[in-house]
Amino acid sequence: MAAAAFGQLNLEEPPPIWGSRSVDCFEKLEQIGEGTYGQVYMAKEIKTGEIVALKKIRMDNEREGFPITAIREIKILKKLHHENVIHLKEIVTSPGRDRDDQGKPDNNKYKGGIYMVFEYMDHDLTGLADRPGLRFTVPQIKCYMKQLLTGLHYCHVNQVLHRDIKGSNLLIDNEGNLKLADFGLARSYSHDHTGNLTNRVITLWYRPPELLLGATKYGPAIDMWSVGCIFAELLNGKPILPGKTENEQLNKIYELCGSPDESNWPGVSKMPWYNQMKSSRPLKRRVREIYRHFDRHALELLEKMLVLDPSQRICAKDALDAEYFWTDPLPCDPKSLPTYESSHEFQTKKKRQQMRHNEEAAKKQKLQHPQQQHSRLPPQQHGVGQSHAAPLWPAGPNHPMNNNAPPPQIPAGGHYYGGKPRGGAPVPNRYPPSGNQTGGYNNQSRGGYSSGAYPPQGRGAPYGAGPRGPSGGYGVGPPNYSQGGGQYGGSGGSGRGQNPMGGARNQQYGWQP
């Protein structure tokens, strides 16, 4: 067998031998992710006390053995060794059906469980985003973006496409290190590859226009579009292209980047779905207009990432040389970043669901047991020698018992009801303004989410809070076509878009060429 050249992968080698140790060597502590073909647990190695992440590969959907996506992920991860790529430590097995699988249908004739053992990471970007009140500083954004691009450049040099870059697949530890994770959709490629590749990859909000238009021949540029969406999300404080369907996703891209034609994207008219999904009217590019509040160097880099024509899109290596990373404030040292309580998207999603459940239960309880209304009517008054009770209230001008009283004269500025004034004249600005009146973007520091001044460089909190969706991370699930789920590749369902052509975002696609 031919040896791979230095710095290149040899994907012709057989998959690594696993199963030398049992999962009983680990104690499961807490579930931190879940996806279509697996769960992820934080676990402790009993002998050493080391904390790891155990990703269980679900076998009940596979009739003839090991899932091809898991084989591909293992082969790639065993050969990628970089500080910004998640480390697969080993494979362990469980000889029989786990307690987690009791009662579940089993279509696989091969019994037992298989686990991938990863280094443990404290957070993913989506989990941090759900922490209220936290924001990234400009040096933090630069630090994380630099690590993301460095890891992705390493993958591309080694001819690996990630094909699912999104916040929940970017893992961060409490030493500030960011690592690419969830290589379940990754695959090797070569520039002279003549076969077709699937376009059913990359979560919808981060999917580039060429895939949405049906391209089956593509390269590293697809990952760079996703990086551009992440970059803008960090600067803007929320996802920039939250489409619900493929048509809506393309429309959002057109509204931001302009509608494609032969002048700005040669050959686009020959794309398989161009005629069915082209813009109904010509649209101009508005990236600079919409994000004019961004730092000048940040906007220049973003413009080069969000280019419709993939052949003109900036590559990871050139992005690392952009002025953005070499002007003040410079990227901070990862070790200078603050530490946070563990923030896995799977966990934060469960907390949000529990809060919604509690709120709904409280509303239901209130409807079923309304508070008793107490009468506020004054007691009846009886005059001396009167045989009948006097009316409780004097008759109004239109009451049948009052035939003589003229209708009241309503003075200007008052509000009358039944002949009696209610309230005073309208008061302008009755409630003083409160909260952030500047729109939420820190123009002074150029890059955070809120209007206040940033904390000292390198000590800020992560980027803003807001609804998020699936979890990715260690590769628990295949493409998460809506944004939600569990870290390490888990993908529970939360609401980050939908995959109109594949059902739920956690749909198992099996073989992904």
Swiss-Prot record:
PROSITE patterns: PROTEIN_KINASE_ATP, PROTEIN_KINASE_DOM, PROTEIN_KINASE_ST. Transmembrane segments: none annotated. Residues 461-476, 483-496 have a biased composition (Gly residues). Residues 26-325 form the Protein kinase domain. Residues 337-513 are annotated as: Disordered. Residues 434-448 have a biased composition (Polar residues). This is Cyclin-dependent kinase C-2. The lineage of its organism: Eukaryota, Viridiplantae, Streptophyta, Embryophyta, Tracheophyta. The gene is CDKC-2.
